[in-house]
Amino acid sequence: MSGLASKAKSRVKSSKGKNSTNIHADELNEDVGVVVRVMTAVVDVKFASGKIPKILNALESKEIYNGKKLVLEVSQHISDSIVRCIALDGTDGLSRNDKFIDTGAPISVPVGRGTLGRVFDVLGNTIDECGPLEESSYFIKQIYSEIPKLTDQKIATEILVTGIKVIDLLAPYLKGGKVGLFGGAGVGKTVLIMELIHNIAKAHKGVSVFAGVGERTREGNDLYHEMIESGVINLENKDQSQAVLVYGQMNEPPGARLRVALSALTMAEYFRDAENQDVLFFVDNIFRFTQSGSEISALLGRIPSAVGYQPTLAAEMGAMQERITSTNSGSITSVQAIYVPADDLTDPAPATSFAHLDSTTVLSRQISELGIYPAVDPLDSTSQALSADVVGKEHYDVAKEVQRILQTYKSLQDIIAILGMDELSEEDKLIVARARKIQRFLSQPFHVAEVFTGAPGKFVSLEDTVLSFKGLVEGKYDHLPEAAFYMVGSIDDVIKKAELLQKEGKV
């Protein structure tokens, strides 16, 4: 339960001794307003003159709509008596003169140990049909909070091992850092984020919080069951669960999709600040957060900015992203899937996210068309952690040599397409052969895709990854066929696959 109802009731009871249930549209008091205009997801509410609610306050309906009370969030003051609000649920059935109560505070959600193993909506209501939360197991906290002071923040220098070769080698993640998974439609963002949840959250000793922002309901359901199967959520004993899920899916109004990331982040901040934990914060998808803000902005009457986005895009993104940080109390490591419209990384939505991230993992349609998954572009993906001071000299040197070989291969592709391989020098032929093996070795079978591929998932340690690629760039495996490097884990798997291919006479 969100706690909005109880706050509203207590305020209404204490307001000048009046019984607010008998108030008509022309007898407004400071707590009760009436609807004067409805524009789908935006609603205008009139209060007594000079007694309007503060910006960001939550208003709760007195009537029931679609089986529950409707909550609005104050966004603008239109006059000294009218506020323009964002609806956080569907407005079907809402009409003029319907009454709303000012709760006197912003949206609040439950935080604490009692939230573990549960699924919530944007308002903090449980939606997993496992009953209400135990009263003693949670606290209520507003979804808006101050950004931690610079003196309280901590710099991340420790590598977070994901078990995914291409990420650990070329764009490593920092523990306590922010990571963006960029990609167009259908290149594997959600599968990659689910594999990261499987690999990291399962081995992670702290708490994981997942925010489903405007994505498919089916994927949210799949993730919930995946977490149950992997033991991250324990239905029998919720206290042993390690994850909280907060969903505002595609079918929900833009107001819910705009605020659900903040609701989830509030829960993550509690575990960081009050319980001194290292928290994993997954968001799928940040673009939907931006998109919902654009929908709301148009309805609020703001003049659109570049490519039709809201003029407040940078401010909204910054207000959320700057709260995702590590402090002296604990850390929040954030992994965010970011949809790239029309595969254009210069689009304002993904471009605004870049400035806030420590690591960027770019998924490429060209690589996915080659059948290489995860379709991570090893040349476009970046990480602040890829320096000799953080990852060590050996790792850094191997990663840079891998990138050099791949870059050389990329520059030779036009010549190969026009003149063929025979026109290349012997040195270039060797580079091309190694690059093709590296390209295939960067593929990897995922645990979460086992049901589709039939191939068991592989987790590769950082040490194995560095040693395997070191041998590859030094030419130790030049004698092995290309096919042996495709969809395997460590170099030992490559050698076994090469022997198997030889026995079957396929090489």
UniProtKB/Swiss-Prot annotation:
GO CC annotation: plasma membrane; proton-transporting ATP synthase complex
Pfam family, one: ATP-synt_ab
Subcellular location per the Swiss-Prot or TrEMBL entry: Cell inner membrane
Record's bilayer topology term: Peripheral membrane protein
Binding site for ATP: G183, G184, A185, G186, V187, G188, K189, T190
Catalytic EC class: translocase
Entry keywords, A to Z: ATP synthesis, ATP-binding, Cell inner membrane, Cell membrane, CF(1), Hydrogen ion transport, Ion transport, Membrane, Nucleotide-binding, Translocase, Transport
Entry-linked SMART domains: AAA
Location of region: Disordered: 1-22
Any one GO molecular function term: ATP hydrolysis activity
Presence of keyword Transport: yes
Catalytic activity as recorded in UniProt: ATP + H2O + 4 H(+)(in) = ADP + phosphate + 5 H(+)(out)
EC numbers for this chain: 7.1.2.2
UniProt xrefs under InterPro entries: AAA+_ATPase, ATP-synt_VA_C, ATP_synth_F1_bsu, ATPase_a/bsu_AS, ATPase_alpha/beta_chains, ATPase_F1/V1/A1_a/bsu_N, ATPase_F1/V1/A1_a/bsu_N_sf, ATPase_F1/V1/A1_a/bsu_nucl-bd
Subunit and interaction comment: F-type ATPases have 2 components, CF(1) - the catalytic core - and CF(0) - the membrane proton channel. CF(1) has five subunits: alpha(3), beta(3), gamma(1), delta(1), epsilon(1). CF(0) has three main subunits: a(1), b(2) and c(9-12). The alpha and beta chains form an alternating ring which encloses part of the gamma chain. CF(1) is attached to CF(0) by a central stalk formed by the gamma and epsilon chains, while a peripheral stalk is formed by the delta and b chains.
Sequence similarity: Belongs to the ATPase alpha/beta chains family.
Role: Produces ATP from ADP in the presence of a proton gradient across the membrane. The catalytic sites are hosted primarily by the beta subunits.
Name used for this protein in its record: ATP synthase subunit beta
Organism: Ehrlichia chaffeensis (strain ATCC CRL-10679 / Arkansas)
